Amino acid sequence: MTLKDKKAIKKILRIAKKHPDLYSKAEVMYAKIIKKRLKRMKVTLVQATPKPEENMAYIARVSNPSNQDNENYSGLLKYCIKHNHWSVFEQAFMTLEIETTRAIAAQILRHRSFTFQEFSQRYAKSNELGKIQLPDLRRQDLKNRQNSIDDLDPFTKQKLEAQMITLFSSAQSLYNQMIEYGVAKECARMVLPMCTPTRIYMTGSCRSWIHYIQLRSAHGTQKEHMDIANACKSL
């Protein structure tokens, strides 16, 4: 979704509040759903190696002690990338806080060069991270089983989203009821959908982050995961 789309949604909600007769209830409801989605994914910097570029360049010049304090490190790091001297980029680290869904978290956790800490549904109630949000619906790419195309009919979307609202509300109510009856959280969580929100702390070296961003911002990555990779890149 582009910045222009985001501004259009905010404008619809602002005008609808002042002039409720201009938009149908369905249009306003749909705009609110999209607005919630914009807040669902969030990437925040927690900590990083101080002066990472300077630190990596200093270490890279370990065999040239007389030149280790050279402040011109930009060219050196570009040279290391060009010639695949990746060990240099293992000397700086970064930790990010990522808010996403359980479905996307499962994909992120497959990157084994990172260390993770994830919100535990066994220890805490799942709704502590907010309500279950509706996922974006896209058409299946018939030529690539792991790809989707964002051209699904809007009326089909609205019809299916109405059913999802009912389904998710029912799942959340059942989950709450199970907790009230004393069912263990590790058992009650089984009724929750994959788009249940979660939070991950992801720590890795600069080398790992470069590889992750290159891989997950490329074509073929699920859109929700691609958005996270691009957000990581912007940091």
Regions found by a protein language model. Give the residues of each.
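Family-specific signature for flavin-dependent thymidylate synthase
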Residues: 1-235
